[in-house]
């Protein structure tokens, strides 16, 4: 038996959010919440009873402590996080946006210690004592050394027989489409379950067509066991060893949007860890809706809430 069900690594961040009705350049208050795509996935799975670990490199100080408290508090093993005596935390600022203005993200994550990681930073014997390694394109995008570390982790996990989950999660503010393809495409023959939206499939991997077409072509071209593709509000598509399936997306009121995609990935991986990705997508659709109901990148929930009916009634 492995020590973990899922391990992952990424940059620990702090999100600073402008209150609705204000702009970053003129606001007087900001809401502070810990953030990080990989940590969000590990945190959601930990709340569902999975054994998860997250690795990173963070400085000493209150902001790093705030991050650690958030994810340790929901059960994520943070013993593989490297604490450094100096350095800074990665930040990002968000304006939620109100029509006709879109939401806007401003990154402030240059010169962090995490950007300096190499394959030698982490103890892979410990981190790869797991059923699944989860990696994202966000971490690969930061620097050449983080891309090298993601590549090493995937190759070493594959060599050891560990299943690999990859979320392309393309961010145009972090790297170009060409560089994303250069780094990520060579990893795909080692990946078991791929999360790639229709738009990411088009931009990064050269696909074309509607959601079902892109989803099916990704699975066929790269010979993946499972491909899960979101297409904004149009739906979710699955192709893989469980066949092909389309899932509708139910629009819900939004309190806070960041983290909902990570919550979907985490819910889907909960099913994958039980050998049922289709059931997992159902969980993911549920958890991503719950993510939109409260502030913060990390979705807070209990296992019972996976089955709770969607309602505005009071549960008494």
Where are the model-predicted features located?
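Structural motif
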Residues: 5-7, 129-132, 193, 226
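Conserved phosphate-binding/catalytic region of the ribokinase-like
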Residues: 1-7, 155-156, 207-316
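Glycine-rich phosphate/adenosyl-contacting loop at the front of the ribokinase-like
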Residues: 1-77, 316
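Structural alpha-helical scaffold elements that stabilize or flank donor/cofactor-binding regions
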Residues: 125-126, 186-187, 220
């Amino acid at each position: 038996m492995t020590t973990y069900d899922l391990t992952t690594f990424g940059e620990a961040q702090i999100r600073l959010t402008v209150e609705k009705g204000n702009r970053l350049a003129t606001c007087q208050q900001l809401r502070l919440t810990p953030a990080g795509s990989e940590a969000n996935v590990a945190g959601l799975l930990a709340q569902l009873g999975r054994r998860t670990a997250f690795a990173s490199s963070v400085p000493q100080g209150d902001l790093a402590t705030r991050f650690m408290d958030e994810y340790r508090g929901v059960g994520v093993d943070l013993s593989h996080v490297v604490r450094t005596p100096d350095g800074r935390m990665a930040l990002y600022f968000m304006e939620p946006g109100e029509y006709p203005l879109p939401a806007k993200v401003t990154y402030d994550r240059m010169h962090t210690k995490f950007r300096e990681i190499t394959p030698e930073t982490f103890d892979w014997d410990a981190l790869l004592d797991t059923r699944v390694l989860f990696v994202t394109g966000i971490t690969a995008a930061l620097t050449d050394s983080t891309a090298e570390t993601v590549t090493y982790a995937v190759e070493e996990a594959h060599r050891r027989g560990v299943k690999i989950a990859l979320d392309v999660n393309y961010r145009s503010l972090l790297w170009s489409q060409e560089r994303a393809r250069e780094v990520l495409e060579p990893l795909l023959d080692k990946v078991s379950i791929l999360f790639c939206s229709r738009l990411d499939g088009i931009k990064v991997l050269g696909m074309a067509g509607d959601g079902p077409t892109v989803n099916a072509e990704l699975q066929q071209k790269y010979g993946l066991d499972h491909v899960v593709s979101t297409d904004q509000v149009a739906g979710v598509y699955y192709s893989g060893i469980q066949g092909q399936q389309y899932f509708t997306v139910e629009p819900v009121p939004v309190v806070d949007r960041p983290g909902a995609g990570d919550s979907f990935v985490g819910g889907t991986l909960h099913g994958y860890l039980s050998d049922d990705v289709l059931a997992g997508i159902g969980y993911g659709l549920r958890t991503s809706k719950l993510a939109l109901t409260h502030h913060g990148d990390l979705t807070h929930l209990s296992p019972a809430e996976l089955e709770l009916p969607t309602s505005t009634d009071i549960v008494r």
